[in-house]
């Protein structure tokens, strides 16, 4: 038997996918990078508060990097805006596993923009907490 054939995976069920290990490694590096960006450029928090939808003015490169990181996160556990009454009352909800109802936060917001910025701030807090 040749050396190449001995190292082949014959039964895929015996193969452990190591991509999760690398994802965790690089995700921790990205979290540190994101917090460094926020600490070195605190003006991006004010920029987001003034324009949470991003349609008034194109976001700065630093804010774009933070947004890109938040958007690439797994769906379960993400925050979204729940509208209690259209154009009037908004809350933050958390996406949960299939078949589970979303978890609604207690805090209420008058505008969707206020709620969007609150989600942004909460995501920053979560990243800081994960690094602590």
From Swiss-Prot:
Entry keyword annotation includes Hydrolase: yes
Keywords associated with the record: Hydrolase
UniProt-listed Enzyme Commission number(s): 3.5.1.56
Enzyme class: hydrolase
Keyword NAD: no
pH-dependence of activity, as noted: Optimum pH is 6.0-7.0.
Modes of activity regulation: Activity is slightly inhibited by Mg(2+) and Mn(2+), and slightly increased by Cu(2+). Activity is slightly inhibited by the chelating agents 8-hydroxyquinoline, ethylenediaminetetraacetate, o-phenanthroline and 2,2'-bipyridyl.
Thermal behavior of activity: Optimum temperature is 50-55 degrees Celsius. Stable up to 50 degrees Celsius, inactivated after incubation at 60 degrees Celsius for 30 minutes. Activity decreases below 50 degrees Celsius, with 20% of activity retained at 25 degrees Celsius.
Catalytic reaction list: N,N-dimethylformamide + H2O = dimethylamine + formate
GO molecular function: N,N-dimethylformamidase activity
Domain of life: Bacteria
Summary of the function given for this chain in its UniProt record: Hydrolyzes N,N-dimethylformamide, and to a lesser extent N,N-dimethylacetamide and N,N-diethylacetamide. Has no activity against the substituted amides N-methylformamide, N-ethylformamide, N-ethylformamide and N-methylacetamide or the unsubstituted amides formamide, nicotinamide, acetoamide, benzamide, acetamide and acrylamide.
Complex and partners: Heterotetramer of two DmfA1 (alpha) and two DmfA2 (beta) subunits.
Protein name: N,N-dimethylformamidase alpha subunit
Lineage: Bacteria, Pseudomonadati, Pseudomonadota, Betaproteobacteria, Burkholderiales
